[in-house]
C-alpha cells in the first residue's frame, strides 16, 4: 500500500488535539482494515467506479484512500467534521453525520452502492435489523471485546 504523506501529516497534526484519533489508526485497526481491503480486492467484486458506503466511519481509516468513491456515515458530528475538514480534506469522500439506522433504509445511495462496509458492528444493533433495498455486497466485522464501554454487539 502506498503511503500518502499528506494524509499522514493531517493525522499527526489533528492527533495533537485529539488522542482518540490515534486509536482509529492503531496497529489493530490498521491490520483489520488492511485485511478487509485485501479480501475485497481478491473477490474482484468492484469496478473502478464502484460506490462504497462505510457505516460507522469514525474518523475515517485506510479504507478511504483504498477506494475511489466513498460515502462515510457516522452518528458523531464532531468526528465527521474532523474527518471531512482536517484529515481527509483532499479526498473525494461524502461524509454524512447521521444514525445509520435512520439514514440507510430510505437512501437512494444505498440502492445504487456496490459495497457496504461496517467495521464498527460492535457499536451498533444487529445489522439484521437494518432492512436495505440493495444488491450490494456486505463486509461487516465486529470483535470480542465485550468489556469495552459502548460495545453492544460483540461476537466470539
Regions found by a protein language model. Give the residues of each.
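S-adenosyl-L-methionine
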Residues: 1-48, 75-115, 119
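A short acidic, amphipathic alpha-helical/loop segment
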Residues: 65-66, 106-109, 126-132
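Conserved acidic residues
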Residues: 50, 68, 111-114
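Conserved class I S-adenosyl-L-methionine
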Residues: 47-59
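Conserved SAM-binding motif I beta-strand of class I
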Residues: 69-74
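Conserved SAM-binding loop of SAM-dependent methyltransferases across substrates and taxa
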Residues: 58-68
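C-terminal substrate-binding/active-site "lid" region of AdoMet-derived donor-dependent transferases
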Residues: 125-156
